[in-house]
Amino acid sequence: MAKLHDYYKSSVVAELTKQFSYTSVMQVPRIEKITLNMGVGEAINDKKLLENAASDMAIISGQKPLITKARKSVAGFKIREGYPIGCKVTLRGERMWDFLERLISIALPRVRDFRGVNGKSFDGRGNYSMGVREQIIFPEIDYDKVDRVRGLDITITTTAGTDEEGRALLAAFNFPFRK
């Protein structure tokens, strides 16, 4: 079992129960899933780019990504409905906790000029979204085999009802918010 999950059960639940004075342990917010998304708009010209992006995502997440397709045609972007234009992965359970641990302790500190993540990127319901500009911050990605530096979107979905509860949950895991 992931260390972060054990830490959540042993310390975070008690800490948040006291902070927000919950009456039941089931009221304490928890992380439901982490969604990784990589948009590869250039894939309309070169299918190899999407394959490389999907393999990078599989290495980062430890799970095969789902190829996302365009929902509708947009002439300005030269895409048609159904064209493959990206990939996404939804992590739950053990893989989710492993990924979160690697994100907090290894990947984010490797970002150049890192001062913390934006604390205002909550959606109003306690879910947090952030973007990563380079996939090479993850140690699993071999820098020499990368054909193109791509970014990805990371969304952490929680059961928290408010942004304040969501921020307290992530802060309890020592999530590096900007001061």
Swiss-Prot record:
Between which residues do disulfide bridges form?
none
Give the highest taxon in the source lineage.
Answer: Bacteria
Entry's SUPFAM superfamilies? RL5-like
Which GO BP annotation is one of this protein's? Answer: translation
Q: Which Pfam families match?
A: Ribosomal_L5, Ribosomal_L5_C
Kinase as a keyword? no
Record PROSITE patterns? RIBOSOMAL_L5 (PS00358)
InterPro entries, per database record = Ribosomal_uL5, Ribosomal_uL5_bac-type, Ribosomal_uL5_C, Ribosomal_uL5_CS, Ribosomal_uL5_dom_sf, Ribosomal_uL5_N
GO terms of molecular function? RNA binding; rRNA binding; structural constituent of ribosome; tRNA binding
User: Which keywords annotate this record?
Assistant: Ribonucleoprotein, Ribosomal protein, RNA-binding, rRNA-binding, tRNA-binding
Keyword Transit peptide belongs to the record: no
Q: Identify the Gene3D superfamilies for this entry.
A: 3.30.1440.10
* Gene Ontology, cellular component aspect: cytosolic large ribosomal subunit
State the family named in the UniProt similarity comment for this chain.
Belongs to the universal ribosomal protein uL5 family.
Q: What does this protein do?
A: This is one of the proteins that bind and probably mediate the attachment of the 5S RNA into the large ribosomal subunit, where it forms part of the central protuberance. In the 70S ribosome it contacts protein S13 of the 30S subunit (bridge B1b), connecting the 2 subunits; this bridge is implicated in subunit movement. Contacts the P site tRNA; the 5S rRNA and some of its associated proteins might help stabilize positioning of ribosome-bound tRNAs.
- Oligomer and partners: Part of the 50S ribosomal subunit; part of the 5S rRNA/L5/L18/L25 subcomplex. Contacts the 5S rRNA and the P site tRNA. Forms a bridge to the 30S subunit in the 70S ribosome.
The record's annotation in HAMAP family points to:
Ribosomal_uL5_B (MF_01333_B)
The protein here is known as Large ribosomal subunit protein uL5
Origin species, per record, is: Vibrio cholerae serotype O1 (strain ATCC 39315 / El Tor Inaba N16961)
